């Protein structure tokens, strides 16, 4: 089993923590996107793009309701950032998590995963995210509510149509 598949399974397993909190799979994927962005900035030594005091380690070093309230404020502050990319990622961001203990558990689990094994592999993090989107799509009414297009089909359509730069293909 590849490390990406293993990590996707672990991340998807964490969704069960939030299911009882009323968080849908689609909301979980969005929540995970925010947390993984913060974690990977830390892992890659790119924390400097984030405002001081609003970085992964600042979040990890808090627990319970203090962490929960900080996370909510953090999402707002990052959405108000003057940095174009941060603002676009976090604009109008909010958390769907209601219980502070669930956020703490999720952050602890994410922090304990072995990211080094996949981050430098070809397609590593992109494949990880694609795996999560696929699982979300497969959840039917509770998930994305749409069909997930398998990578093999996407590659075949691209190969057969031979799109030029700037052209768009819809599936």
Predicted regions and their residues:
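Non-catalytic, mostly N-terminal accessory regions of nucleic-acid modification and defense proteins
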Residues: 1-165
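Class I SAM-dependent methyltransferase core
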Residues: 171
């Amino acid at each position: 089993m590849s490390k990406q598949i293993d990590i996707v399974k672990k991340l998807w397993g964490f969704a069960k923590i939030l299911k009882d909190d009323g968080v849908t799979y689609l909301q979980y994927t969005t929540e995970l996107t925010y947390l993984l962005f913060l974690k990977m900035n830390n892992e890659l030594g790119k924390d400097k793009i984030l405002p001081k005091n609003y970085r992964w380690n600042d979040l990890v070093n808090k627990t319970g309701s203090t962490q929960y309230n900080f996370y909510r404020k953090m999402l707002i502050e990052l959405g108000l950032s003057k940095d174009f990319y941060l603002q676009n990622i976090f604009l109008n961001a909010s958390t769907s998590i209601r219980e502070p203990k669930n956020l703490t558990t999720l952050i602890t689990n994410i922090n304990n995963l072995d990211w080094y094994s996949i981050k430098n592999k070809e397609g590593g993090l992109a494949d990880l995210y694609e795996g999560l989107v696929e699982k979300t799509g497969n959840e039917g009414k509770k998930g994305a509510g749409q069909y997930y297009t398998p990578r093999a089909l996407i590659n075949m359509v691209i190969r057969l149509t031979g799109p030029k730069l700037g052209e768009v293909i819809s599936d």
